[in-house]
């Protein structure tokens, strides 16, 4: 489940019209959500608040052997009007799961960002600042986001920790998204790492208006999207590099059948080949599989996962109301009013099992999880934990 600050950052992307899914780093987002989720350990409590449309705070307290915690602050120059209260927030916005990719949208025109007053430009570029300190480790994380243009964004992330080389590291990303394609230029102070990533979407260009067909029957709707991408990076100090490439096909909302996503990624230097397949088998069920193979060592690994959304049943009195008023429909207080939670499960070929139950109780968001190892009969449970979130 997304924590409060991650959800606020996603709201900033949404308000500034930035598509986080149109990048090479998000190529396997669905498989990671269904197969790479972490089970909580111990007890963790988070209390957060959006004190103003531009300012948010969050406090976290945990107990895993020792008591630890963190304090977070976030500032956004762009007012965020979204409802972040844990009692009313849509669970689909905070629970990672099967991703339905939407149609590519045309980027905003540059002139639409301009604001003039008395013959002078007074507009400012949208900016987000975020800081988090971990106690008692005294580890500090910071994030700087700035929208440079409708198709360009600068992201600078920094970590200060005495356990890291040189006491910390800084990662800089210059991201460009034109709809049809996206690029990322990366530099990290760790080993002076430089990199480049790109993603290209085949099919119609959202920047070009479609031409009117001579006959209506000539219109062929696009039901899926095929994407190809690659990344290349090189460390100047350690004189080592790497690369990977990937393919993805996913259905779009107008697809008449079951939504599904297929990906294939290859790291030729390490010899790793990975393929994933995820399908939305029903309104409340999603299935996913991943097969990894190394053609240098001939080792392979298979993982299976699923998510099952639990929906509330009809109330005991609803049938009686419908008898009296056949046209009555139960009003929904929120988009996920009928959703009680989601159950996630994953298993690999070595007998390692992960279970996760996420949902809402009254005004609290909760995550209850366990990690098991079926091959160790004397100690099957590897970890058990629960996380509670409250936001106002």
Swiss-Prot record:
<dbReference type="GO" id="GO:0070096">
    <property type="term" value="P:mitochondrial outer membrane translocase complex assembly"/>
</dbReference>
<keyword id="KW-1134">Transmembrane beta strand</keyword>
<dbReference type="GO" id="GO:1990456">
    <property type="term" value="P:mitochondrion-endoplasmic reticulum membrane tethering"/>
</dbReference>
<dbReference type="Pfam" id="PF12519">
    <property type="entry name" value="MDM10"/>
</dbReference>
<keyword id="KW-0472">Membrane</keyword>
<dbReference type="InterPro" id="IPR023614">
    <property type="entry name" value="Porin_dom_sf"/>
</dbReference>
<dbReference type="GO" id="GO:0032865">
    <property type="term" value="C:ERMES complex"/>
</dbReference>
<comment type="similarity">
    <text>Belongs to the MDM10 family.</text>
</comment>
<dbReference type="GO" id="GO:0000002">
    <property type="term" value="P:mitochondrial genome maintenance"/>
</dbReference>
<keyword id="KW-0812">Transmembrane</keyword>
<dbReference type="GO" id="GO:0045040">
    <property type="term" value="P:protein insertion into mitochondrial outer membrane"/>
</dbReference>
<dbReference type="InterPro" id="IPR027539">
    <property type="entry name" value="Mdm10"/>
</dbReference>
<dbReference type="GO" id="GO:0015914">
    <property type="term" value="P:phospholipid transport"/>
</dbReference>
<keyword id="KW-0496">Mitochondrion</keyword>
<protein>
    <recommendedName>
        <fullName>Mitochondrial distribution and morphology protein 10</fullName>
    </recommendedName>
</protein>
<comment type="subunit">
    <text>Component of the ER-mitochondria encounter structure (ERMES) or MDM complex, composed of MMM1, MDM10, MDM12 and MDM34. Associates with the mitochondrial outer membrane sorting assembly machinery SAM(core) complex.</text>
</comment>
<keyword id="KW-1000">Mitochondrion outer membrane</keyword>
<comment type="function">
    <text>Component of the ERMES/MDM complex, which serves as a molecular tether to connect the endoplasmic reticulum and mitochondria. Components of this complex are involved in the control of mitochondrial shape and protein biogenesis and may function in phospholipid exchange. MDM10 is involved in the late assembly steps of the general translocase of the mitochondrial outer membrane (TOM complex). Functions in the TOM40-specific route of the assembly of outer membrane beta-barrel proteins, including the association of TOM40 with the receptor TOM22 and small TOM proteins.</text>
</comment>
<dbReference type="GO" id="GO:0051654">
    <property type="term" value="P:establishment of mitochondrion localization"/>
</dbReference>
<dbReference type="GO" id="GO:0001401">
    <property type="term" value="C:SAM complex"/>
</dbReference>
